[in-house]
């Protein structure tokens, strides 16, 4: 009898320890992220890390301050600037007009902006604006094109500015109205167009110098042209909602979504890889290591924000990191974004 009891006890012990170890294996990333951020080296982390899978929150923590001067603690639902993550929203709005037949991706800009003063409007297409092959420089629209349109890659905020002008002209609506409607569609209730009223609810951006001193940016100096591809107000959780709506087929037809997430040009980015990866419409496409990764970064030193939004379609996982600091030392600007990405990619979460 004692032998039978002991055997049953051993079986139960093995079973429950197996369940426990399985549970531990299931989350092999949270403690590593905590430890990484707790080390505060080579710089401190000041922001929110938000990880979601299949609509369920897997990790959500805020570290640091919304205002470094006042030492106001950051909260999970605080609002940050998207920086260039906004480009994918602009791209979706343009593609929705493509589906309506009001915009032709292969048409030159002149077709939609006949009075545009730049000669390159006769040759640069909407497609080239969206995938950064227009030849336009990043922040100076008056400079001659860097190369023949369609022949190379050059990241261009001005390209998205022009795409935004085309969008407003062909839709007959302001970008503010369009993006506000898009936020409602995606139930992004903690996000907004950065008008004067909404901007008051944005966390303060901080520019961190190489000597570790910082400048608190009381007001953002973005003009309307930056909203097309460089600045919208979102919370990390809302950005995860955006990923669900975009990648589930709720915003674009399958063929249109495929256009957005396909690429004909490649480019290097320090966060993703040492090798060139694809650039679609407002999205970087990394298909180099048997784990499709779709995402974009955002960084603005002068306004003081750093962000990354990553999505892994196979496991329906979002990894969102938003900081209200931007470091002048670019070697460490994306340090935590890079390291957290590595932790997640090596974890069981994506398997």
Feature-to-residue mapping (PLM):
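Mobile, glycine-enriched helix-loop/loop "lid" segments at the mouths of ligand-binding/catalytic clefts
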Residues: 198-214
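Catalytic loop of the DD-peptidase/beta-lactamase superfamily, centered on the K-T-G motif
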Residues: 19-62, 168, 176, 180, ...
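Hydrophobic transmembrane-helix microenvironments that flank and shape a buried ionizable site
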Residues: 3, 81-84, 191, 235
